[in-house]
Curated annotation (Swiss-Prot):
Gene: rimP
HAMAP family, per the entry: RimP
Family the entry assigns: Belongs to the RimP family.
Pfam families: DUF150_C, RimP_N
Function: Required for maturation of 30S ribosomal subunits.
Assigned keywords, A-Z: Cytoplasm, Ribosome biogenesis
GO cellular component, as recorded: cytosol
Subcellular location: Cytoplasm
Protein name in the entry: Ribosome maturation factor RimP
Length: 153
C-alpha cells in the first residue's frame, strides 16, 4: 500500500468536511493492475456513518478530484466507514478509544517486540499508553507504524 500524499490527504479531509464528515484515513491500494483510492470517514463520536454520508462524500470528492486532478491514471474511488477495526491515527483517537483493545505495530523493536496488543489506557504526556499481560507500554506517536482497534466479540 502507498500512503496518499499529504496534499491529497488534506484535500480529501477538506472535501469530507464540506460533506459533513471527518476523514479517518485515506490510502491508495493497488491490486494487480487496478488502483483504488480508499477513503474512510466518520460523522462524530456518537453518530454512525450512513450510506447517504458515504454517497455525499463520494460526490463531493469526485467533483474535487475531477477539477484538481491530483491522481494520474485510472483509479476507483471507494468511500466507507472505518469499520470496527478502525485505524488509530492521532493522539485524539488513542484518547477517545481509551479502554478499548488495540493492536499497535511499531517502526522498530521495543523490548524485543514490534507488535503489541492490549488495552488502551489513553494518552499521558503526549505518549500513548497500552497495558497487556506483559505490563504497561508507552510510545510516542512517531514510534507507531500503524495501529487499529481490535473488536471484542
Amino acid at each position: 500500500m502507498v500512503n496518499v500524499e499529504d496534499r491529497l490527504y488534506e484535500g480529501i479531509a477538506q472535501q469530507a468536511g464540506i460533506a459533513g464528515c471527518t476523514l479517518v484515513d485515506a490510502r491508495m491500494v493497488r491490486t494487480g493492475r487496478a488502483v483504488a483510492l480508499q477513503v474512510f470517514i466518520e460523522k462524530d463520536e456518537t453518530t454512525a456513518v450512513t450510506i447517504e454520508d458515504c454517497a455525499a462524500v463520494s460526490r463531493q470528492l469526485s467533483l474535487w478530484l475531477d477539477v484538481e486532478n491530483p491522481i494520474h491514471g485510472a483509479y476507483r474511488l471507494e468511500v466507507s466507514s472505518p469499520g470496527l477495526d478502525r485505524p488509530l491515527k492521532n493522539l485524539h483517537d488513542f484518547e477517545r478509544f481509551k479502554g478499548s483493545q488495540a493492536e499497535i505495530h511499531l517502526h522498530g523493536l521495543t523490548q524485543g517486540r514490534r507488535r503489541l496488543q492490549g488495552e488502551l489506557l489513553g494518552v499521558e504526556d503526549q505518549k500513548i499508553v497500552l497495558k497487556n499481560a506483559e505490563g504497561r507500554w508507552t510510545f510516542a506517536l512517531d514510534d507507531i507504524h500503524k495501529a487499529r482497534l481490535v473488536p471484542q466479540w
